[in-house]
C-alpha cells in the first residue's frame, strides 16, 4: 500500500506530482504513513490497481501496416488453396459438420464470406421467363374495339358497374 495515491505508470516515467509540488509524487510513495493529500479520494486509489493503457504503437506511419496486411491476406489465400476442396458428403456427415446448434450453417469462416456480393439460391430463386399466354377477349371487348370512342367508354362503364354496384340499392360493397 506504499503507492496508494499514485497511478501506475510505465517503467522509466515519473507520475506527475500534486499541484505545486514538482516531483512530489514520489515523496508520498516513499513515506510509509499512507497519508496523502488525495487519501480521501477513493476513485484515485482504485485507478492505481489497473494498468494505464497508453502503450507503444506497433505500426509506424510509414506504410508498414499495409505491408503486414498484404502478407496476412496472401497467407490466408495460400491456406485456402492448400485445403482440399470439400467433396460430396453424405447427409449424415454434413449434419455433423454443421454443428448441433445451427443445421444450415457450414463450418469455417470461408463459407460465409463466399456469399458476399452474390445472389443466394442460384436458379431456384430466379423468375421464370418465357411467352405469356394472352387472355382471350370477351364479346363485349370485341364489339367495343370496332366502335367509336363513346361505345368504348360506355362498355367500360358497364364493366365497372357490373363489378362495383348493385342495381337494386345503388350501393357498392365494402372494400377490405
Curated annotation (Swiss-Prot):
Optimum pH is 6.5-12. Zn(2+) inhibits the RNase activity while Mg(2+), Ca(2+), Mn(2+), K(+), Na(+), EDTA and EGTA show little effect on the exoribonuclease activity. Keywords: Acetylation, Exonuclease, Hydrolase, Nuclease, RNA-binding. Optimum temperature is 37-75 degrees Celsius. Its EC number is 3.1.13.-. InterPro entries: TRIR. GO terms for biological process: rRNA catabolic process. Residues 1-121 are annotated as: Disordered. The modification N6-acetyllysine is found at residue 146. Part of the telomerase RNA 3' end complex which contains about 488 proteins. This is Telomerase RNA component interacting RNase.
Amino acid at each position: 500500500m506504499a503507492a496508494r495515491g499514485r497511478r501506475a505508470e510505465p517503467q522509466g516515467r515519473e507520475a506527475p506530482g500534486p499541484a505545486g509540488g514538482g516531483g512530489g509524487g514520489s515523496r508520498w510513495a516513499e513515506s510509509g504513513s499512507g497519508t496523502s493529500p488525495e487519501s480521501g479520494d477513493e476513485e484515485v486509489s482504485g485507478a492505481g490497481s489497473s494498468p494505464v493503457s497508453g502503450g507503444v504503437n506497433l505500426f509506424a506511419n510509414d506504410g508498414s501496416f499495409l505491408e503486414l496486411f498484404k502478407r496476412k491476406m496472401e497467407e490466408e489465400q495460400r491456406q485456402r488453396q492448400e485445403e482440399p476442396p470439400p467433396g460430396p458428403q453424405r447427409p449424415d456427415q454434413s449434419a455433423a459438420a454443421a454443428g448441433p446448434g445451427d443445421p444450415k450453417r457450414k463450418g469455417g469462416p470461408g463459407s460465409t464470406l463466399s456469399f458476399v456480393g452474390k445472389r443466394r439460391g442460384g436458379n431456384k430463386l430466379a423468375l421464370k421467363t418465357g411467352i405469356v399466354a394472352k387472355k382471350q377477349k370477351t364479346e363485349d371487348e370485341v364489339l367495343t374495339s370496332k366502335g367509336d370512342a363513346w361505345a368504348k367508354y360506355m362498355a367500360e362503364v358497364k364493366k365497372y358497374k357490373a363489378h362495383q354496384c348493385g342495381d337494386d340499392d345503388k350501393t357498392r360493397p365494402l372494400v377490405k
